[in-house]
């Protein structure tokens, strides 16, 4: 399955993605992330590693995916990416990605995305609340969401990654 998580800067996209990766890793699943996550079942990778045909099955987190697989990347992109995005299931991979808006993301990735999640965050002094609503990707932001939830911020999630970590654009993904 491929899921996109969208929201403005500071609205909890990476937090939500890291929370999901930690939950999967806690259950014993191998996970990979381009953002360093402090968990024994999460391996840090770079974007080029994602197209490696020998990457073992698992859950992959692509944070700020629009920096590498942006809407304008089509002609510059290495063909290995199109192969990967069309066949993640065959490789035993699920993909979670974050971006500030779905329009910034490569069309092929958007078209292959099962669900899009819109994140919001509210700070109430001592408590921070995160909320997410999901739609099938082709219905994103239209009508009643297919799923929704909210939860209080988790210190464990916050401590497992650096919210200031900047994704470096690796030119190796281009032709």
Task: Report each predicted region and the residues it spans.
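Hydrophobic anchor at the beta1->P-loop junction of P-loop NTPases
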Residues: 5
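The conserved Walker
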Residues: 8-10
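Conserved lysine of the Walker
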Residues: 13-14
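Loop/turn-to-beta-strand initiation segments
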Residues: 28-30, 56-59, 91-97
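Short glycine-rich substrate-engagement loop in P-loop NTPases that contacts/grips substrate
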Residues: 32-56
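Walker B catalytic acidic pair
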Residues: 63-65
């Amino acid at each position: 399955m491929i899921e996109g998580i969208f929201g403005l800067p500071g609205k909890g996209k990476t937090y939500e993605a890291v929370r999901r990766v930690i939950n999967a890793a806690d259950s014993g699943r191998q996970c990979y992330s381009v953002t360093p996550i402090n968990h024994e079942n999460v391996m840090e990778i770079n974007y080029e590693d994602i197209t490696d045909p020998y990457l073992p099955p698992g859950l992959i987190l692509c944070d700020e995916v629009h920096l590498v697989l942006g809407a304008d990347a089509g002609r510059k992109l290495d063909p290995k990416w199109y192969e990967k995005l069309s066949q993640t299931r065959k490789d035993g991979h699920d993909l979670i990605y974050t971006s500030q808006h779905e329009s910034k993301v490569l069309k092929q990735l958007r078209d292959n995305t099962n669900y899009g999640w819109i994140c919001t965050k509210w700070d109430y002094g001592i408590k921070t609340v995160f909320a997410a609503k999901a739609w099938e990707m082709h219905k994103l932001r239209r009508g009643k969401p297919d799923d929704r939830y909210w939860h209080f911020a988790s210190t464990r999630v916050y401590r497992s990654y650096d919210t200031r970590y900047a994704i470096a654009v690796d030119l190796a993904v281009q032709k």
